[in-house]
Amino acid sequence: MSLLSDLINLNLSDITDKVIAEYIWVGGSGMDMRSKARTLSGPVKDPSKLPKWNYDGSSTGQAPGQDSEVILYPQAIFKDPFRRGSNILVMCDAYTPAGEPIPTNKRNNAAKIFGHPDVAAEEPWYGLEQEYTLLQKDVQWPLGWPLGGFPGPQGPYYCGTGANKAFGRDIVDSHYKACIYAGINISGINGEVMPGQWEFQVGPSIGISAADELWVARYILERITEIAGVVLSFDPKPIQGDWNGAGAHTNYSTKSMRNDGGYEVIKKAIAKLEKRHKEHIAAYGEGNERRLTGRHETADMNTFVWGVANRGASIRVGRDTEKAGKGYFEDRRPASNMDPYVVTSMIAETTILWKP
């Protein structure tokens, strides 16, 4: 095993200029992540300089067998925390050979929204809070929970420490450092209310970069849990009963909101979001109805409510924002399995471009 470990950690930069590029894309379910690697003749820092590539879309649920070729377009580059050196992770989106985005390519439409002059002028910032649950591999039961049983009730686990409260911290810290190494703007981590559940935050990041970074952070976490022999779940309600679900709270601001008088802009934006509540809920993640029940720090999905410092609201405004008269707000509706390309661009579209 020591030889295998040595080979895994082999530093190729001592002997060659060649680098390995791991191309990453979103699979057919809209949540599964796929990747494959190729050799490049030398380091590349601009995604437009990377070659397009193809894959078998019939094996990912993204193309029929008789016309299975799907084309990957490189969009964002990150340092590879697994191979290190000059090796890279490449976030891609997927197109038909004719150049049309495939149905599961949500990045293409997001890029159009973020590229709109009115949106670009507002410089939308996002802070994405990604909750997730770690499961024991063979039984699909949360890490640290007794087999076939339940731990003590919620209370001591949120930001808790100790062997009977925090389960999987090595995975969480490894992921934190790996994201920083990769160049992802990860801003923090914490243990969540349900034992075995954790959260990391990405941002503040501007526009589509926030979604690129969250997808790659998810990919890195998936790879780390693979190494650890633990299953990663983004199910918005992994355990039924008196246990918190998992969300992806989305913090958002525009230049107008961050400037003096921004609180009035925030209130107008929230009024727009209320008018399109059903459309947003429909796009905010599969199975979210099991989470948005009005309990466990959520608002009922059929009701829109906003408030200051209210974690039972659809939209929460922080007390600092209210006091300063400018700042940001938090959309608490997105589920943990949401597509960040969809959610971030939809919030921008509704609050900046949409005319009621």
Swiss-Prot record:
One of its GO terms (cellular component) is cytoplasm. Keywords: ATP-binding, Cytoplasm, Ligase, Nitrogen fixation, Nucleotide-binding. It catalyses: L-glutamate + NH4(+) + ATP = L-glutamine + ADP + phosphate + H(+). Coiled coil: none annotated. It is found in: Cytoplasm. Residues 19-99 form the GS beta-grasp domain. Residues 106-356 form the GS catalytic domain. It is an enzyme of class 6 (ligase). InterPro entries: Gln_synt_N (IPR008147), Gln_synt_N_sf (IPR036651), Gln_synth/guanido_kin_cat_dom (IPR014746), Gln_synth_cat_dom (IPR008146), Gln_synth_gly_rich_site (IPR027303), Gln_synth_N_conserv_site (IPR027302), Glutamine_Synthetase (IPR050292). Belongs to the glutamine synthetase family. Homooctamer. This is Glutamine synthetase cytosolic isozyme 2. The lineage of its organism: Eukaryota, Viridiplantae, Streptophyta, Embryophyta, Tracheophyta.
